[in-house]
Amino acid sequence: AEVRSRSMSCNCMTRTSQQKCQSMRKWSWIMEVEHVTHEFKPIYNKESKVLMLGTMPSPKSREVGFYYGHPRNRFWKVLSDVCGEEVPETKKDKITFALRNHIAVWDVLAGCEIRGADDSSIRNPKPNDMNLILKEAPIQAIFATGQKAAQLYRRYCYKDTGIEIICLPSTSPANCRVSYEELYEAYSVIQEYIR
């Protein structure tokens, strides 16, 4: 109940948030297409049980040097609520939190051409080798943090892993149609794998 009540303030379907979403989509099309190479190390260890896969780090994530780095991205908040912990703030805290809860974090792509943070603009994708993690960790389930990540995984990675991916809603601030309550409910599915 505590998590539910705290989450009420995070529903981003307010008028102001809708305007921010529209503004973000507008500006993403003004940005130039650029070639992006993934530079973050995957987060995992030999006790990781679930693998959370995004598509590629956003410009803001690349700026701060870590996964889901946009201040309005709800990834770390929803995972911490699902795990019953405080939201990790620093890069070190996020790594410690993920490993303590048997969560591996990476992205589907090692590189691509993309316009801003707009996954729909991705061209010439180059996939990461998921077996880097799978051969070391007892991964029981793989989750995509958005439809594009799931689509790319199924196209480029599934043939090598043989593990189906479960698609969860995006935690991106651009995904304002999904409330925090809906995110929390969707991401709660990981509990059965990490306990």
Positions of PLM-derived features:
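Short catalytic/ligand-binding loop motif for oxyanion handling, primarily in non-cytosolic enzymes
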Residues: P59-R62, E113-G116, A150-Y153, P173-R177
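Short, surface-exposed acidic-centric catalytic microdomains
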Residues: K60-S121
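Short, hydrophobic/glycine-enriched beta-strand segments
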Residues: K49-T55
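Internal catalytic-core helix/loop-beta-alpha segment
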Residues: R100-A149
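Low-acidity, Ser/Thr- and Arg-rich intrinsically disordered low-complexity segments
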Residues: R4-S17, C21-S28
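Short histidine/acidic/glycine/proline-rich micro-motifs that form metal-
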Residues: F66, I139, S172-A174
